[in-house]
Each structure stands twice: as C-alpha cells, then as structure tokens.
Amino acid sequence: MGSNFIVALVMLLNASRADVQLRPFHEDPTLSGRAQQRAEFLCNARRFDHDGMMAAFEGSPYRWKGENIAKGHRDAKAVHVQLMNSPGHRANILKPQFDSVGIGQACDITVELFGGR
C-alpha cells in the first residue's frame, strides 16, 4: 500500500470534487497520521465502526469533522467506488465545508479523515 495508494486516492477524491466544481482537498499531514493510527487501531482491534472517531480530531483546528471508513479493498479505485456508492460517505467527500483530508490504511481497512475550518 503506502504512498502510491494514498496519492491515487487523493487524486480520485479531488477528481470527484472537481466534477461538482468543489475545490480540491489539501492533504493534511497531521490528519494523515491520525488516519493511519485509526486504521491500525481498527485493524488490530478487529473492529469496523465510527466509535471513537472524534478522538482523532482532538486538538485539531477544524470546525467541520468527518470520517469515511472502507473495508475489503486494497486498491484505491475500488475503495473510492465503494465510498462514492454510499450516500453518507459520498456526502463527506463532496461536502463543501471540508477542505483537508488525511488517509490511513491497515489490513484491508481505509480511513479518510476530513476537516474544514
């Protein structure tokens, strides 16, 4: 996985936003680190839920906060298609208030953390 996966996923996210005339996400290194920690936690705990999501934003400057989680894919395009086909996840990707993203991946779990000021 690693950086190629994340670069590809950010490109897909930004392409989807461009399709509806939204500005692209800025990749936030702090959110990325927290998304990676969250993905590792979910993987190691064998969980797949949004419980505890707000802890990932503790101390962050973001007014708007959101999380997408996907499971079962290790390919960026497959993850993106899965999330775009889910109304709630799609809403996060296309939420105008979000301007920053961080992505983490562990096992077959992908975490996208979104922030907006």
Locate predicted features.
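Disulfide-stabilized extracellular recognition modules
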Residues: 15, 71-117
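A short alpha-helix/helix-coil micro-patch that ends at or immediately precedes a cysteine
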Residues: 2-44, 59
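Surface-exposed patches in mature extracellular/periplasmic domains of secreted proteins
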Residues: 19-33, 46-56, 90-105
